[in-house]
Amino acid sequence: MILELDCGNSFIKWRITTKSDAAVVSVGVVDSDAALLEHLRNLSDTTFSDCRLVSVRSAEETARLVSVLTNAFSVTPVCAVPARELGGVVNGYDDFERLGLDRWLAFVGAYHLVKRACLVIDLGTAVTSDFVDAGGAHLGGFICPGMPLMRNQLRTHTRRIRYDDTEAERALVRLVPGRATAEAVERGCSLMLRGFALTQVEIARGYWGDDFAIFVTGGDAALVADVLPGARIVPDLVFVGLALACPLR
């Protein structure tokens, strides 16, 4: 079995897969190293002999997690590192080491799945988009605040905007003009993300006409799925790229 980790800014996504055919055996999302250890220790009928991870945390935080995993489970995690080229995709950043590793692995994974031009939109704490042409050249992309950042900025800097997560969830049932603060904020932010997504599609069409694939990933992918007909929703896209970056024997 293989333990795979995607260590983001806010959460750690983990899954355990079989080594033979990459079938997913167990999966979860936690908000701390301690919670990760607790979940993994409670998997009484599942063990793993290998581990690979991608992290956008600081080097010190990543090293600490690697040490914890090594001591707790006697595995040596293999960490993804920046690369100029991977899986037939050429990194388009002027300084390739500055491109976020999770973002890089997501569009490398997307290209690996289709081997054609693709647009990859990742909706997490931040929202990113990336464009890869049919030959594997990364043309660049965009970054904007995701739903959590927009929501928290309004709550932090506007005194009268206060509501809980339950209200936020109810507000997104439909996207008519809000008649309460939670509705107005949640629907407004959602519409901004949908507009962002549609703009990315128009940019992609300017490059390739209709000859490209659209991938959507990240925790808030559902917010834009209905305005992107034909898009492939792939929650574990980063893990597809991670397998290419960190192959295990």
UniProtKB/Swiss-Prot annotation:
Catalytic activity: (R)-pantothenate + ATP = (R)-4'-phosphopantothenate + ADP + H(+)
Location within or outside the cell: Cytoplasm
Family matches, as PANTHER family: TYPE III PANTOTHENATE KINASE
Amino acids binding K(+): D122
Name of this chain's protein: Type III pantothenate kinase
Keywords assigned by UniProt, alphabetized: ATP-binding, Coenzyme A biosynthesis, Cytoplasm, Kinase, Metal-binding, Nucleotide-binding, Potassium, Transferase
Active site, UniProt feature: D102 (proton acceptor)
Gene: coaX
UniProt-listed HAMAP family: Pantothen_kinase_3 (MF_01274)
Chain positions recorded as substrate binding sites: Y93, G100, L101, D102, R103, T181
